[in-house]
From Swiss-Prot:
Extent of the signal sequence: none
Entry's Gene Ontology cellular component terms: cytosolic small ribosomal subunit
Residue ranges of the TM segments: none
Keywords: Ribonucleoprotein, Ribosomal protein, RNA-binding, rRNA-binding
Gene source species: Stutzerimonas stutzeri (strain A1501)
Similarity-based family: Belongs to the bacterial ribosomal protein bS18 family.
Gene Ontology MF term list: small ribosomal subunit rRNA binding; structural constituent of ribosome
Protein name stated in the entry: Small ribosomal subunit protein bS18
Function of the protein: Binds as a heterodimer with protein bS6 to the central domain of the 16S rRNA, where it helps stabilize the platform of the 30S subunit.
UniProt gene name: rpsR
Gene3D superfamilies: Ribosomal protein S18
Length: 76
């Protein structure tokens, strides 16, 4: 019987040595947003709590400045 091995989650920001997450770095922020526009939780992405807080703040700032959409599905 084959066993299913789940891939180990790791924090990308810790591995790359990132100090602060910038709200202008849209490519990074888009990786942590679902297709409906919600922020993906850290239990799914493996991001550490410190960086998850920075990520949420950066995404909210980018949304406020209209760099990112609040939702992707407007009346479909």
């Amino acid at each position: 019987m084959a066993r299913f091995f789940r891939r180990r989650k790791f924090c990308r920001f810790t591995a790359e040595g990132v100090k602060e997450i910038d709200y202008k770095d849209l490519n990074t922020l888009k990786a942590y947003i679902s297709e409906t526009g919600k922020i993906v939780p850290s239990r799914i992405t493996g991001t550490k709590a410190r960086y998850q807080r920075q990520l949420a703040t950066a995404i909210k700032r980018a949304r406020y400045l209209a760099l990112l959409p609040y939702t992707d599905s407007h009346g479909r």
